[in-house]
């Protein structure tokens, strides 16, 4: 079975590894190298790093739809499938029509819910109790193709986007193999998607500023959903305090939302519109993330300050 693989971030790496193990991967497409870090050195994508270990031809089109030479090369390869995992470019009908059986995309949501760029973040921000992966036969729409298989996982009360990402990253590779086998053997008939959806738009940093006039649970979900990026924050005495870990306490407070009502080694209690939020791990400017117990060992957090 000849496979062309298209993907870019670390989420796609286990799927690429599995494709290399099970099939004949004839080409890898990934996004161009990008400047990274303070030194702005050019960095390879995670998929390129993995592909180089296996001496598979790697192509990095700026825009695949405009790269005639590469499109012709893909046609010459005559792949049975093109497998797409977080590639970062939309495929034209011309490219979608190249493989014998079609293009399969692994998407990290239970479609049709959470189409779009940030499905894991939004599922947690919205307080969903489950998420998962869906494989689909791609069409020209954005995450609208006919569904092949789904794999559902529980979102536990304190799970972060990073933790959910790492679970689905590994499980997605298995789902792709089952999908490839099912489609190529004719054992699976893809199913059309319904219209009910929540569009998981790309995150921007503005969402990270905590509104204390929300319930403790809503804020807890925001903190989980924005970890590991961009990290929810609030202002403490004109200093930005990034918040990495919280817990909802079913307690009442008559203080204004955002007021620090108690500080102990267990955490910082903050009044919310509903219930109380316990802040357990924070980061201040020029510091590293610390538990509250670690932080108050050398610094003070005052009660009755209102977080902004």
From Swiss-Prot:
Keyword RNA-binding: no
Enzyme nomenclature, EC number: 2.1.2.9
UniProt binding sites for (6S)-5,6,7,8-tetrahydrofolate: 109-112
A single cellular component GO annotation: cytosol
Domain of life: Bacteria
Keyword Nucleotidyltransferase belongs to the record: no
CDD domains: FMT_core_Met-tRNA-FMT_N, Met_tRNA_FMT_C
GO molecular function: methionyl-tRNA formyltransferase activity
Catalytic activity: L-methionyl-tRNA(fMet) + (6R)-10-formyltetrahydrofolate = N-formyl-L-methionyl-tRNA(fMet) + (6S)-5,6,7,8-tetrahydrofolate + H(+)
Pfam families: Formyl_trans_C, Formyl_trans_N
PANTHER family given in the database record: METHIONYL-TRNA FORMYLTRANSFERASE (PTHR11138), METHIONYL-TRNA FORMYLTRANSFERASE, MITOCHONDRIAL (PTHR11138:SF5)
Entry's family note: Belongs to the Fmt family.
Function field: Attaches a formyl group to the free amino group of methionyl-tRNA(fMet). The formyl group appears to play a dual role in the initiator identity of N-formylmethionyl-tRNA by promoting its recognition by IF2 and preventing the misappropriation of this tRNA by the elongation apparatus.
Classification via NCBIfam families: fmt (TIGR00460)
Protein name: Methionyl-tRNA formyltransferase
């Amino acid at each position: 079975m000849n496979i062309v693989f298209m993907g870019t971030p670390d989420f796609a790496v286990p799927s690429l590894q599995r494709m290399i193990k099970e099939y004949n991967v004839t080409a890898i497409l990934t996004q161009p190298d990008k400047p990274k870090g303070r030194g702005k050195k050019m960095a390879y994508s995670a998929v390129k790093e993995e592909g180089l270990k296996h001496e598979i031809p790697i192509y990095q089109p700026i825009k695949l739809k405009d790269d005639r030479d590469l499109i012709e090369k893909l046609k010459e390869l005559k792949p049975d499938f093109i497998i797409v995992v977080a590639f970062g470019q939309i495929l034209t009908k011309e490219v979608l029509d190249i493989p014998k059986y079609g293009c399969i995309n692994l998407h990290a949501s239970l479609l049709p819910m959470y189409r779009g760029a940030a499905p894991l973040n939004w599922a947690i921000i919205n307080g969903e109790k489950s998420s998962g992966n869906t494989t689909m036969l791609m069409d020209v729409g954005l995450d609208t193709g006919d569904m092949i298989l789904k794999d559902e996982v529980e979102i536990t009360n304190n799970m972060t986007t990073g933790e959910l990402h790492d679970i689905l990253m590994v499980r997605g590779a298995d789902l792709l193999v089952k999908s490839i086998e099912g489609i190529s053997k004719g054992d699976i008939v893809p199913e059309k998607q319904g219209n009910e959806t929540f569009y998981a738009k790309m995150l921007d940093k503005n969402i990270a500023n905590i509104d204390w006039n929300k319930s403790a649970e809503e804020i807890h979900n925001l903190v989980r959903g924005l970890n590991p990026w961009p990290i929810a924050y609030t202002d403490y005495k004109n200093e930005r305090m990034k918040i990495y870990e919280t817990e909802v306490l079913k307690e009442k407070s008559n203080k204004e939302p955002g007021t620090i009502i108690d500080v102990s080694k267990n955490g910082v209690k903050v009044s919310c519109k509903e219930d109380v939020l316990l802040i357990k791990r924070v980061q201040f400017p020029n510091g590293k993330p610390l538990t509250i117990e670690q932080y108050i060992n050398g610094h003070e957090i005052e009660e009755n300050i209102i977080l902004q």
